[in-house]
From Swiss-Prot:
Keywords: Chromatin regulator, Metal-binding, Methyltransferase, Nucleus, Repeat, Repressor, S-adenosyl-L-methionine, Transcription, Transcription regulation, Transferase, Zinc, Zinc-finger. Residues 241-360 form the SET domain. Putative histone methyltransferase that acts as a transcriptional repressor of smooth muscle gene expression. Promotes the transition from differentiated to proliferative smooth muscle by suppressing differentiation and maintaining the proliferative potential of vascular smooth muscle cells. Also plays a role in endothelial cells by inhibiting endothelial cell proliferation, survival and differentiation. It is unclear whether it has histone methyltransferase activity in vivo. SMART domains: SET, ZnF_C2H2. It holds the Pfam family PRDM2_PR. GO terms for cellular component: nucleus. Interacts with HDAC1, HDAC2, HDAC3, CBX1 and EP300. Residues 29-42 have a biased composition (Gly residues). This is Putative histone-lysine N-methyltransferase PRDM6.
Amino acid sequence: MLKPGDPGGSAFLKVDPAYLQHWQQLFPHGGGGPLKGGGAAGPLGAPQPLQPPPPPERAEPQPDSLRPRPASLSSASSTPASSSTSASSASSCAAAAAAAAAAALAGLSALPVAQLPVFAPLATVAAEPLPPKDLCLGATSGPGPSKCGGSGGDGRGVPRFRCSAEELDYYLYGQQRMEIIPLNQHTSDPNNRCDMCADNRNGECPMHGPLHSLRRLVGTSSAAAAAPPPELPEWLRDLPREVCLCTSTVPGLAYGICAAQRIQQGTWIGPFQGVLLPPEKVQAGAVRNTQHLWEIYDQDGTLQHFIDGGEPSKSSWMRYIRCARHCGEQNLTVVQYRSNIFYRACIDIPRGTELLVWYNDSYTSFFGIPLQCIAQDENLNVPSTVMEAMCRQDALQPFNKSSKLSQAPQQRSVVFPQTPCGRNFSLLDKSGPLESGFNQISVKNQRVLASPTSTSQLHSEFSDWHLWKCGQCFKTFTQRILLQMHVCTQNPDRPYQCGHCSQSFSQPSELRNHVVTHSSDRPFKCGYCGRAFAGATTLNNHIRTHTGEKPFKCERCERSFTQATQLSRHQRMPNECKPITESPESIEVD
């Protein structure tokens, strides 16, 4: 950094008057008055030194200390300097370097300068090697010691301009090495490539939607991306926002449907779409895959037709709603409304839970007896869209159980709120209004919803009594009651049903006693008299009459009986069973 010294130095520059005028405009606040471009500035021995401008962070020099020398003095003063050729050459180089440094500091390198002569003493000092740290620019007016901050021959202090080597290098060459680093305002474009169109677009794909929707459908896991499951139709992009496609938790199945948001209890999903098949075609064995097959019944419980959703191009996304393996994971039940199949949420389904459907809690309808659910409210809203929550009160009245299931079907009343929230819907088919006569009764302001009997085809398709087949694991049973016990872990009130007729019993012993009435032959014969009996228990009781064995003994009176029923009747009689008492001992009196 250049620092001003004491006045009276011997080194000065002859500067053009235009340069001085511009200098005065840059520093108008100086305390020494205006700069003057010509005229004598005092005697030759005491010229005013030229002080280059400091950088903005340093103290500004006083303008009145800058006094240019006249032209006559320049030529006269240059006479002593012409004594040595080498010194003149060195002084020219040093003066050029000092002028370039001053111009770089003031930012005035474009201003014209007439000539830059310096005195010989300055050249002598500048020709010396630069010090390692500080550079001293100046001269002495006479012989004497020449060092920074020293004194000349006249005893006065010699002005020195001090700057470090780093500062000089910065002001001379620093701006040439400066590089402007532009701000990286470029942001990478999002990946808008549509994998289905195989095309890069500026925005989202107009046909297949944004990329996040595709990720929501096919999943983002590496396993799913490495080996995607087959059978991905194009219409899967039409999934409603309430659900999304997922990997099914049921073993052996690729896809499933899970809840994308919380689904309230009572939400209706449907209708189920598929191909209508006549019962004769299904019973003939033309349909091999019955996994997506539903039955439609009329008001009398007669099978009308089947809805087959096995073909993806003619069905909807509801075909991927799988059947529950047990009652614990079931969250949807099947409801038939007129000639359509709907799924209804029987519990609140959390987000991320797979939708699994199964039959309602009355499995009697599963075996050929359709239930009639009578809605007590005329304002029953049946959705026509894919999914609509109806916000109903789930107050279900108990069944009106009949003693004989073969004579009259059970009835179940579903109570809906008087002011259902949401929107009102009218169920319309593509071909027009649905038939209004189906599932309606004569009672005013009541509507009948027949629950579907998905495997009541066991009544017709598997007419033979030993071919009862499970719709989940395809396991066959010899009796329908065995299939019923296999399907439902919570048995109804009468789970034991006769394989020869439609009667059912609550205890297995009652069923065994009833089965004997269907058989005319008596396979159990007595070995003593040859009499035949229908049951083994009856034969054993008869044999005791020949042997005289009485294994049943009363603990009170110690009487024995042949059958347990005889002992029970004996204990119930008040006067027949008397405890045995010992006679009192006789007392001898002397």
